[in-house]
Amino acid sequence: VHLTPEEKSAVTALWGKVNVDEVGGEALGRLLVVYPWTQRFFESFGDLSTPDAVMGNPKVKAHGKKVLGAFSDGLAHLDNLKGTFAQLSELHCDKLHVDPENFRLLGNVLVCVLAHHFGKEFTPQVQAAYQKVVAGVANALAHKYH
């Protein structure tokens, strides 16, 4: 991902304020509610029958935290996203058979959740930088599919 020094600074400054536990669960939960077909990958998570059930599900929250932990690793290695996400790409492709389009959807949901949490601080410039990052992460996660 090519970010200007200003974009990198904006991304890392905002990320330092992110509550990974809260935002991770919310982002994954929203993905499962807004794109219900993604729930098929999480059948072992129990009750996902209503938006409230999804958003309150402890397994959704725990996995969302795990997902954002991996995203944090990616932010620390923006110049090597394919290497950083190689094992996760292989896992999601070969073992879990996740449609790589879901990575793009989750990235877009994450941007929406960040905008909601940070309001005016999530300026158009910050959003543009985050869109680049989530697109880069989605491409890295889809790498083994090509």
Swiss-Prot record:
CDD domains from the UniProt entry: Hb-beta-like (cd08925)
KW Hydrolase (keyword) present: no
Binding site for heme b: 63, 92
Keyword Nucleotidyltransferase: no
Residue numbers of N6-acetyllysine PTMs: 59, 82, 144
Positions bearing S-nitrosocysteine: 93
Modified residues (N-acetylvaline): 1
Globin domain segment(s): 2-146
Keyword terms of this UniProt record: Acetylation, Heme, Iron, Metal-binding, Oxygen transport, Phosphoprotein, S-nitrosylation, Transport
SUPFAM superfamilies named among the record's database cross-references: Globin-like
PROSITE patterns reported for this sequence: GLOBIN
Entry's Gene Ontology BP terms: hydrogen peroxide catabolic process
Positions where Phosphothreonine occurs in the chain: 12
Tissue-wise expression: Red blood cells.
GO molecular function per UniProt: haptoglobin binding; heme binding; hemoglobin alpha binding; metal ion binding; organic acid binding; oxygen binding; oxygen carrier activity; peroxidase activity
Coiled-coil features, chain-numbered ranges: none
UniProt superkingdom: Eukaryota
Recorded GO CC terms: blood microparticle; haptoglobin-hemoglobin complex; hemoglobin complex
Residues bearing PTM Phosphoserine: 44
Annotated function: Involved in oxygen transport from the lung to the various peripheral tissues.
Family to which this protein belongs: Belongs to the globin family.
UniProt-listed PANTHER family: HEMOGLOBIN FAMILY MEMBER, HEMOGLOBIN SUBUNIT BETA
Assembly with partners or alone: Heterotetramer of two alpha chains and two beta chains.
Record-given protein name: Hemoglobin subunit beta
